[in-house]
């Protein structure tokens, strides 16, 4: 018999009312759930049959495990009491017991009762790639129909969303709004109620949720300001500065005064803010501490000013009018969502599909029809696992099935709620936790998973940062993890924090976006690899729970967790493999980027249209055609002009060996082209496999089984595609890219728990798992805060649209968007903190934290300066200002007076330090460029070029497949001045497509700032900085932009001849949008002679009008020089020519000149 703790026993045996069990990580909640079911069916008086219990789990795997464990326990007890008929009865009932996911339970309700209520009972579940594709298809059809009708509301909405280039923002907004509404019990009502919030029907603004949010946020920031001033006052006291001490005390009183005014109302607070003046700071000459105290006070004053600009810059009397004005955009948006919902349902019904959301909504409708009474009678108790991840719709279903919630047994841990992006509502759990009496809630805080050192580290960090106002819950004594596992002592099981100093500046790509700090990703990977090898070499041992003995560490005992692997999975794979460590990287991105799938997609493109040079080159230099790079060069050299396909046909006319190879490939291509018109796409894929032997060839590669499984998955996706679309290679390739982006998409996986490999996975993938040794990496990577949204969405607060003046083309925060963006930022931070908690609590015996920090010494000094004023925790403001995990962990570990536990060791790796394994060179990354007539030499190293060729996505399409709309940026390759391809070695090392998650904002931030400059204002560096501060306060720019924008370099623009011309111009049009019809043949040579046009949308950075015509300026943030800059200029020339043509056609005036201005290079280039 297991020795249950008192709280576990209470969770097993308590009866008579609803019960909420808050089970900390590693608390054994599954065992408790199993035992509660067993006690219900075997020992209750009277006992309950197992088919009269409803057990709801989060995943099918969890449901299967639950049934298996119940079966094992029942058999075990039957062996102990062979004649027990009660146990036999429950074993017989177990297969039909309702132990399933909520979706499976809803499906069962529909199958049993649906026909009576008018619902189809036979349908296929639509999920993953097929669901994504069908949604996009329906949405595209709706918008195309409106484009054709010239829908004015749609065009106004596109202008409002700054979507003139393309309608990507609108599509994303419609789908997000659709999903938001569907997570509610009544989607239509939620949409209309959210819209009605903008009718301005309130008596006092102070009675609205808008003001409640303003008041709550302001109070949080006031606490932070007081903490800063308190620290400055402590410095003044330390250095005996009585005048400064007195002044800071006055400052604090002025700040506290705002608390009272907030209670009086909006206008009272606004008036008070306008009257507050801070005195002049003074400090004794030659006395230390001045800079520290002044810096703290300046930060406090800056934050106080931000409160004024962020929340109290509006006129309360204008709120109603402004919000009502915004309905002119929200109303057509809601109409589009409702139309999409209706037509998407029709499309699903036509194909015989239902998605998971349908299951829940249909089941709820059926329950409401009266069926709930029968089910309430049937189920004695409903047990819900992972209750923290429930949403509003699911809660409603459970309420109906249960006896108004009175026979619900709910288990979860709100600290592990990390699925808000899937509409989870942790606040449902939190509200019950706050409302329930002690008799109705139980804390399971004993952790049976982790060593004491890990528990101490987790408690040490989270007791200081997890606070109710900023994290939605408090990490108090009740939440503390407590040791429940008995491990034998091991002196090497302390937790570790490794801080790597990152390089100070990022490389900039052609879109003005910083490339991801390769040094950071690679150095973290190398440090981890070196640490793994060291653990192995030193004979690190882990405790084996089966044998109850220590054994040597194996690779399968190790996991590497990252918040996201979207841009770094390949790096981890390469670096660990290079170190000789067997590794498996989880993630969908690796599917489309795998060699075998890249080759197949390239081949399909060539079959569809061979006039695509890059895919054709990739196929030719693959096992399909078998050409070497030397031979490819020979083909092109003999026919240097025109398409590579024409060059290949020309070569096939000869008699030499290369000509024979070319001829055989062309024959194979023609055969597949004929087959593509006669058989299904899935059959075509099969034929390609059969005739080329690609599965066998890739089976011989390293990881061959996974590669073969990927090829099979590609075939399966072709089958799926056929069910929702008649076919077509181009459409299938679109479907494939959407499939990889789907949250539910899983690439081929051929790995089990017994495989001795290190696993690399996202924190979300690790939920519910545990490992002896856990590395948590990327702690310095910035959180994602999307400030660029024009409309923010929130499940409780509804819409948060920005205000837009169509005449001045100015967007700024409305009261609604300001409040929602702030609320969403806080909720994002709370979720990120829970993600960190999940990551740290996966470890059983060894926890190693790794992060990269720029300006490490300065950062550490900042962390250390946060002194005793912080007391036991960081302030709410300090926590709320975090941009990454290290912004929490750093101050916790380094601040003065921090009681760092002995079980946590910190190691710092400066920029100049060579990390063990640093002698490995960075993998050479080659660029695919449009072909120049570069001499070919035997010495040239073409390592990696085959892959680079496969990765390139070239937009050559048949006329039948031409897009109806495209953006100017889509045309970059089309307008390039070179016309053939090259796989040319470059000295520079770049990794295309890999960006800082925060760095991707840099180009956007520069453009947002430059389009909003007051050209009549102060254009000095300080003046521009002040303009930037205003835009940050208004929410137009993110706070991070303070560090991202170089105001000195921007100021220098206006000292140049070009800048002076801009200032003297008669008219200046920042961000000038245009739409231009272009004949398809001008973009795609294969369309020459056709009358079809393509609608091209774009935005010109700056258009200036002088007496004799216009000139154009395009801002660039590239940091490249020399040959690479010349290549970029060729790419940009076509875009600028199109800009000029658009302006001339629209205005009838001549465009005299076109300029590129490279801000970081401080260089203007006339094109």
Swiss-Prot record:
The residues covered by the UvrD-like helicase C-terminal domain are 478-768
Ordered alphabetically, the record's keywords are: ATP-binding, DNA damage, DNA repair, DNA-binding, Exonuclease, Helicase, Hydrolase, Isomerase, Nuclease, Nucleotide-binding
Where along this sequence does the record place binding of ATP?
23-30
Q: Name one GO biological process term.
A: double-strand break repair via homologous recombination
Q: Which cofactor does it need?
A: Mg(2+)
| Annotated UvrD-like helicase ATP-binding domain residues | 2-451
Instruction: Enumerate the catalysed reactions.
Output: Couples ATP hydrolysis with the unwinding of duplex DNA by translocating in the 3'-5' direction; ATP + H2O = ADP + phosphate + H(+)
Which terms in the GO cellular component ontology are assigned?
Answer: cytosol; DNA helicase complex
Which InterPro entries does the UniProt entry name for this protein?
AddA, DNA_helicase_UvrD-like_C, DNA_helicase_UvrD/REP, P-loop_NTPase, PDDEXK-like_dom_sf, PDDEXK_AddAB-type, Restrct_endonuc-II-like, UvrD-like_ATP-bd
**Looking at the keywords, is Chloroplast present?**
no
Q: Which domain of life is it from?
A: Bacteria
Q: What is its EC number?
A: 3.1.-.-, 5.6.2.4
Q: Name one Pfam family in it.
A: UvrD_C
From the Swiss-Prot or TrEMBL record, what is one GO molecular function term? ATP hydrolysis activity
PANTHER family with a match to the protein in the record:
ATP-DEPENDENT HELICASE_NUCLEASE SUBUNIT A (PTHR11070:SF48), UVRD / RECB / PCRA DNA HELICASE FAMILY MEMBER (PTHR11070)
Q: What does this protein do?
A: The heterodimer acts as both an ATP-dependent DNA helicase and an ATP-dependent, dual-direction single-stranded exonuclease. Recognizes the chi site generating a DNA molecule suitable for the initiation of homologous recombination. The AddA nuclease domain is required for chi fragment generation; this subunit has the helicase and 3' -> 5' nuclease activities.
Q: What family does the Swiss-Prot or TrEMBL record give for this protein?
A: Belongs to the helicase family. AddA subfamily.
Q: How does it assemble?
A: Heterodimer of AddA and AddB/RexB.
Protein name in UniProt: ATP-dependent helicase/nuclease subunit A
> Which gene is the coding source of this polypeptide chain?
addA
């Amino acid at each position: 018999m297991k020795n249950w703790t008192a709280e576990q026993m209470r969770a097993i045996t308590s009866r008579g009312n609803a019960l909420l069990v808050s089970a900390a990580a590693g608390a054994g909640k599954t065992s408790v759930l199993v035992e509660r079911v067993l006690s219900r069916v075997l020992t209750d008086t009277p006992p309950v049959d197992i088919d009269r219990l409803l057990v709801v789990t989060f995943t099918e795997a969890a449901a299967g495990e639950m049934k298996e464990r119940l079966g094992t326990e029942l058999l075990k007890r039957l062996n102990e009491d062979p004649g027990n008929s009660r146990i036999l009865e429950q074993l017989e009932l177990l297969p039909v017991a309702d132990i399933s996911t909520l979706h499976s339970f809803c499906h069962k309700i529909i199958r049993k009762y649906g026909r009576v209520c008018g619902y189809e009972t036979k349908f296929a579940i639509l999920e993953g790639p097929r669901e994504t594709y069908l949604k996009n298809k329906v949405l595209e059809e709706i918008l195309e129909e409106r484009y054709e009708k010239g829908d004015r509301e749609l065009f106004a909405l596109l202008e409002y969303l700054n979507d003139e280039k393309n309608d990507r923002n609108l599509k994303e907004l419609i789908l997000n709004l659709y999903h938001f509404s569907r997570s509610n019990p009544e989607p239509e009502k939620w949409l209309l109620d959210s819209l009605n919030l903008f009718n301005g029907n309130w008596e006092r603004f102070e009675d609205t949720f808008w003001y409640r949010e303003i008041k709550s946020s302001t109070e949080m920031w006031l606490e932070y300001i007081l903490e800063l001033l308190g620290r400055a006052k402590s410095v003044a006291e330390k250095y005996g500065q009585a005048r400064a001490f007195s002044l800071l005390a006055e400052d604090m009183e002025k700040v506290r005064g705002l608390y009272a005014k907030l209670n009086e109302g909006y206008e009272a607070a606004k008036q008070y803010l306008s009257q507050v003046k801070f005195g002049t700071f003074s400090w004794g000459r030659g006395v230390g501490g001045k800079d520290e105290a002044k810096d703290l006070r300046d930060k406090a004053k800056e934050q106080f000013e931000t409160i004024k600009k962020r929340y109290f810059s509006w006129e309360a009397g204008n709120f109603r009018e402004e919000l009502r004005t915004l309905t002119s955009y929200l109303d057509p948006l809601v109409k589009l969502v409702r139309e999409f919902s209706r037509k998407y349902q029709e499309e699903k019904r036509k194909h015989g599909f239902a998605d998971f959301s349908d299951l829940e909504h249909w089941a709820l409708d059926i329950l409401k029809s009266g069926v709930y009474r029968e089910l309430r009678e049937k189920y004695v108790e409903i047990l819900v696992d992972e209750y923290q991840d429930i949403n509003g719709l699911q809660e409603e279903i459970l309420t109906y099935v249960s006896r108004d919630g009175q026979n619900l047994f709910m288990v979860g841990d709100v600290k592990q709620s990390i699925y808000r992006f899937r509409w989870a509502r942790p606040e449902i759990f939190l509200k019950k936790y706050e409302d329930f009496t002690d008799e109705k809630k139980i804390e399971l805080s004993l952790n049976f998973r982790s060593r004491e050192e890990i528990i101490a580290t987790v408690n040490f960090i989270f007791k200081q940062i997890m606070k109710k106002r900023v994290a939605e819950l408090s990490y108090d004594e009740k939440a503390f993890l407590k040791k429940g596992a008995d491990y034998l002592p091991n002196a090497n099981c302390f937790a570790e924090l490794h801080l790597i100093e990152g390089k100070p500046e990022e490389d900039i790509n052609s879109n003005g976006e910083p490339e991801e700090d390769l040094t950071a990703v690679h150095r973290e990977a190398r440090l981890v690899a070196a640490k793994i090898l060291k653990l192995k070499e030193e004979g690190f041992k882990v405790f084996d729970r089966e044998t109850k003995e220590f054994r040597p560490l194996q690779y399968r005992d190790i996991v590497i967790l990252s918040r996201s692997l979207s841009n770094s999975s390949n790096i981890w794979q390469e670096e660990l493999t290079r170190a000789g460590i067997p590794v498996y990287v989880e993630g969908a991105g690796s599917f489309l980027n795998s060699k075998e799938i890249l080759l197949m997609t390239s081949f399909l493109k060539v079959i569809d249209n061979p006039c695509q040079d890059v895919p054709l080159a990739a196929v030719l230099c693959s096992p399909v055609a078998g050409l070497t790079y030397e031979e490819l060069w020979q083909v092109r050299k003999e026919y240097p002009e025109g398409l590579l396909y024409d060059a290949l046909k020309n070569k096939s006319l000869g008699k030499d060996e290369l000509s024979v190879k070319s001829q055989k490939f062309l024959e194979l291509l023609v055969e597949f082209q004929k087959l593509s018109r006669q058989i299904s796409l899935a059959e075509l894929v099969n034929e390609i496999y059969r005739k080329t032997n690609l599965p066998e060839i890739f089976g011989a590669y390293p990881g061959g089984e996974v590669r073969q499984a990927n090829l099979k998955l590609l075939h399966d996706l072709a089958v799926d595609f056929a069910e929702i679309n008649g076919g077509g290679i181009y459409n299938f390739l679109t479907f494939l890219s959407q499939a990889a982006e789907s949250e539910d998409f899983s690439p081929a996986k051929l790995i089990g728990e017994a495989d001795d490999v290190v696993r690399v996975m996202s924190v979300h993938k690790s939920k519910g798992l545990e490992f002896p040794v856990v590395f948590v990496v990327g702690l310095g990577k910035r959180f994602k805060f999307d400030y660029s949204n024009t409309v923010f969405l929130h499940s409780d607060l509804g819409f948060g649209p920005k205000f837009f003046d169509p005449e001045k083309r100015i967007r700024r925060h409305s009261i609604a968007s300001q409040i929602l963006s702030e609320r969403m930022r806080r909720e994002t931070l709370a979720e990120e903190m829970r993600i960190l908690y999940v990551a740290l609590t996966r470890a059983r015996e060894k926890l190693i934290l790794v992060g990269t920090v720029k300006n490490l010494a300065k950062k550490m000094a900042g962390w250390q300066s946060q002194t005793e004023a912080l007391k036991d925790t960081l302030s709410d403001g300090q926590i709320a200002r975090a941009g990454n995990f290290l912004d929490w962990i750093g101050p916790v570990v380094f601040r003065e007076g921090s009681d760092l536990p002995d079980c946590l060791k910190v190691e710092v790796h400066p920029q100049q330090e060579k990390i063990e394994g640093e002698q490995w060179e960075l993998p050479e990354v080659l660029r695919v460029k449009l072909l120049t007539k570069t001499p070919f030499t035997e010495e040239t190293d073409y390592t990696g070029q085959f892959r680079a060729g496969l990765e390139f996505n070239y937009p050559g399409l048949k006329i039948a497949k031409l897009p109806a709309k495209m953006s100017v940026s889509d045309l970059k390759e089309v307008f390039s001045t070179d016309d053939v391809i090259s796989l040319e070695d470059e000295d520079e090392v770049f990794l295309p497509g890999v960006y800082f998650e925060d760095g991707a904002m840099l180009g956007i931030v520069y453009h947002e700032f430059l389009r909003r400059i007051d050209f009549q204002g102060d254009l000095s560096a300080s003046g521009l900085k002040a303009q930037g501060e205003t835009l940050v306060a208004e929410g137009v720019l993110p706070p991070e932009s303070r560090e991202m924008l170089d105001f000195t370099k921007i100021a220098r623009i206006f000292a140049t001849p070009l800048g002076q011309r801009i200032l003297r111009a008669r008219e200046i049009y920042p961000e000038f949008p245009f739409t231009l019809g272009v004949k398809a043949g001008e973009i795609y040579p294969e369309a020459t002679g056709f009358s079809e046009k393509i609608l091209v949308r774009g935005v010109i950075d700056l258009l200036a009008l002088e007496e004799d015509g216009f000139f154009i300026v395009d801002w660039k943030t590239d940091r490249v020089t020399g040959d690479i800059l010349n290549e970029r200029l060729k790419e940009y020339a076509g875009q600028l020519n199109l800009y000029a043509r658009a302006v001339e056609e629209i205005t009838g005036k001549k465009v005299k000149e076109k300029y590129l201005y490279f801000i970081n290079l401080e260089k203007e280039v006339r094109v």
